[in-house]
């Protein structure tokens, strides 16, 4: 009986077609999607970071995919885009897609083994802008969310270095925001001129009223 080893040459699997480098360079064809990430690749400098370039056997993760969520098709083994997928091909529990069953029903039958993200339905309700300003007339019947926060003492003094990342609330006092806004020199000069003109008119009106009062007193006293 003819054996298979006698028919197939042992070096056959090492043979490469001429078009394979093109497929490897353009489409990453034949590469394992679960291969490790290249430690030399720098997304900010992709052309001069990895010495192997596009022929590197490891994965080059672009910076545009660093903040994406995990690919739901990759979780099921059905994604065909490989490295060209817009979503992450890695198990990152913080960037998992949302569990549709939990979002619709409020519970999940796979808990706690579910790999998808369970988002609290209350967190999807937009915050109440009136409550953030200090008072909401609708009270507990308000359709929006009332978030109780402590005012930032640094923000109340004028400036908070943490900005939007601060754990405390930064209230916006819209009534005085225009007065606190830093204005260009031209606007400041115009505003000063308006104030000066207004004060001059008031002084002139006061002077006219005083002079009219004096003339009336003289007329009443008579000669």
Swiss-Prot record:
InterPro entries hit by this protein: CPSF4/Yth1, Znf_CCCH, Znf_CCCH_sf
Stretches with biased composition (Basic and acidic residues): 184-204
Main location group: nucleus
GO molecular function: RNA binding; zinc ion binding
Compartment annotation: Nucleus
Keyword Zinc-finger (UniProt): yes
Zinc fingers, C3H1-type class: 32-63, 65-92, 93-121, 122-149, 151-173
Gene Ontology CC terms, in alphabetical order: cytosol; mRNA cleavage and polyadenylation specificity factor complex
Entry keywords, A to Z: Metal-binding, mRNA processing, Nucleus, Repeat, RNA-binding, Zinc, Zinc-finger
Location of the region described as Disordered in the Swiss-Prot/TrEMBL record: 184-223
Alphabetized Pfam families for the sequence: zf-CCCH_2
GO BP term, pick one: mRNA processing
SMART domains registered for this protein in UniProt: ZnF_C3H1
Sequence similarity: Belongs to the CPSF4/YTH1 family.
Record's function text: Component of the cleavage factor I (CF I) involved in pre-mRNA 3'-end processing.
Protein name: mRNA 3'-end-processing protein YTH1
Organism: Debaryomyces hansenii (strain ATCC 36239 / CBS 767 / BCRC 21394 / JCM 1990 / NBRC 0083 / IGC 2968) (Yeast)
Lineage: Eukaryota, Fungi, Dikarya, Ascomycota, Saccharomycotina
């Amino acid at each position: 009986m003819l054996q298979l080893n006698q028919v197939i040459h042992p070096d056959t699997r090492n043979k490469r077609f001429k078009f394979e480098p093109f497929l490897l360079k353009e489409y990453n064809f034949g590469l394992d999607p679960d291969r490790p990430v290249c430690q030399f690749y720098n997304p900010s400098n992709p052309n001069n970071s990895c010495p192997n370039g596009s022929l590197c056997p490891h994965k080059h993760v672009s910076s545009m995919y660093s903040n994406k969520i995990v690919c739901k098709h990759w979780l099921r083994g059905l994604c065909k885009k490989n490295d060209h997928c817009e979503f992450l091909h890695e198990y990152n529990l913080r960037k998992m897609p949302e569990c549709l069953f939990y979002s619709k029903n409020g519970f999940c039958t796979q808990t706690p083994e579910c790999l998808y993200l369970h988002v609290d339905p209350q967190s999807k309700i937009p915050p109440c802008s009136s409550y953030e300003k200090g008072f909401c007339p609708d009270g507990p019947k308000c359709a929006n969310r009332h978030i109780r926060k402590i005012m930032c003492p640094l923000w109340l003094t004028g400036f908070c270095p943490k900005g939007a990342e601060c754990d405390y609330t930064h209230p916006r006092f819209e009534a005085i925001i225009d007065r606190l806004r830093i204005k260009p020199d031209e606007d400041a000069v115009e505003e000063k001129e308006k104030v000066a003109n207004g004060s001059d008119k008031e002084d002139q009106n006061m002077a006219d009223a005083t002079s009219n009062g004096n003339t009336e007193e003289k007329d009443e006293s008579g000669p």
